Curated annotation (Swiss-Prot):
Gene Ontology terms describing biological process: translation
PROSITE patterns documented for this protein: RIBOSOMAL_L36
Keywords, sorted A to Z: Ribonucleoprotein, Ribosomal protein
Keyword Ribosomal protein: yes
GO molecular function, one term: structural constituent of ribosome
Record protein name field: Large ribosomal subunit protein bL36
Length: 37
């Protein structure tokens, strides 16, 4: 899980989701997991 100031999709499988006030990136590649906030 990377915590970043700007979350971006790394590949086309990445999905950007807003969950309880935090913006997250969910992907089948575990290295692409990110969150902001």
């Amino acid at each position: 899980m990377k915590v970043r100031a700007s979350v971006k999709r790394i590949c086309r499988n990445c999905k950007i989701i807003k969950r309880s006030g935090t913006i997250r990136v969910i992907c089948k590649d575990a290295r692409h997991k990110q969150k902001q906030g």
